[in-house]
Amino acid sequence: TINHRQEQYAVAQTDSLTHDINSVLKYKSQYIGDNSNTANLFYNLPLNNVSMKFQINSDDCSLTVNYLDTIWNIGEEKVQRDLVYNSAAAFSLIDNLTKITYEFSGKSYSFTRSQFENAFGTPLSSLLNQKVWSEKIQSKLDDTTFVEEFY
């Protein structure tokens, strides 16, 4: 049924290995300063089922995402994989975003655009096509060693 397919699609959007990058292309922006655009992007990426708050620093074009839960409660492997995915998506879609910090109760992680462009060997915006995204981003996230290089 249609409802069943919609439910399956919604569940797939909460996992970095099955997320549809096309679903967030409408949030592509040159600037980090648009609060509602940034919030809507993260509300449509993996970990969207965890309550979060945002803080944008327009001086250095950085973003802090404060997840209102613990890593232990969500699962460390899922958190690490999804944060790499969400960072790749955000750096790909927001042109002037330079750094993202993710805060959880008791722990935080920070990533930079250059760290991601070095890891993937290309400007991230060039990967914004579902086939290329699946090959270059999602397929690597299944490799724990690759994901751990970011931590």
Where does each model-flagged region fall?
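Polar/charged, Gly/Pro-rich intrinsically disordered segments
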Residues: 101-151
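A short, structured loop/turn motif at beta-sheet edges
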Residues: 57-62, 92-98, 106
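Short, flexible coil/linker segments at or flanking structured domains
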Residues: 5, 12, 53, 82-90, ...
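A short interface-forming secondary-structure element
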Residues: 65-81, 116
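Structural recognition of the beta-strand scaffold that forms the well-ordered cores
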Residues: 64-65, 101
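Short, non-transmembrane amphipathic alpha-helical segments
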Residues: 75-97
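N-proximal, solvent-exposed amphipathic alpha-helical segments enriched in charged/polar residues
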Residues: 2-62, 69-74, 140-151
